[in-house]
């Protein structure tokens, strides 16, 4: 899951070296993926009306469902 979000984020932003992705297990069935990008790239990650962020959350949810865990994406 972490690798997927990192790949997508680095493909979108102008400063790919500033992308940081961490994964935390809240409990047995919940994973929180935290995405940190440069301030200049936050607009690109969120997208117009949040479409890019929502698409990333949807992909993360699909992968999580396959693995049997609930997921959450936090953009910092």
Stretch-by-stretch model annotation:
Residues 1-42, 55-76:
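RNA-contacting regions in translation and RNA-metabolism proteins
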Residues 46-50:
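Glycine-centered tight-turn and secondary-structure capping sites
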